[in-house]
Amino acid sequence: MLRVISLLVLTLVALPLMAEAPHGYPFLSFDKAMQQARAENKPLFVYFGRYGCGYCDKTNKEAFSDKEVQAAYTRNYVLAYVDSESGKRLRLPSGERITEREVGTRYNAFVTPVFTFMTPDGQPLMRLVGVQRIEDLTEADRKVQQALGGKGKQ
């Protein structure tokens, strides 16, 4: 009984440390986002995070909570969230079976958070690592949109 109570307390203490995709954004799984990006010929924004990532939580609270960032990223990208430690299985548009952890490894997301802007076929365009501020995300969006010929609003 003591063991059950200890596990319950540990779980409740750890919950606030769990980082997830920012609320209010239409984040998809990586495989679904790849399919949608190809169908819409729209670039991807992939957020590599993990449970227990305090820097992910800080970025979520301090940068992704901004309404202008939310509007720009929702408008300009297909959004994907990848838990870089998860064993969740995905099926890529190519038919390849891969876990979220393997996606993280493929895109060198060994620390978190990592934010990777990609072409619709998954080729990296730009990468941000670590805590991001509103200004960082705004400037990255501007640079990616400029590189893509200004498809999204600046």
List PLM regions with ranges.
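Thiol-based oxidoreductase modules, predominantly thioredoxin-like and allied folds used
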Residues: 24-27, 69-98
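Short active-site neighborhood of thiol/selenol oxidoreductases, capturing the structured segment around
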Residues: 40-54
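Non-catalytic, surface beta->alpha helical segment in thiol-disulfide oxidoreductase systems
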Residues: 62, 106-150
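Typically the conserved alpha-helix immediately C-terminal to a functionally engaged Cys/Sec
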Residues: 57-72
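The canonical Cys-X-X-Cys-His
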Residues: 53-57, 115
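A short beta-strand-turn-helix
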Residues: 26-44
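Positively charged n-region of N-terminal signal peptides that target proteins for export
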Residues: 1-4
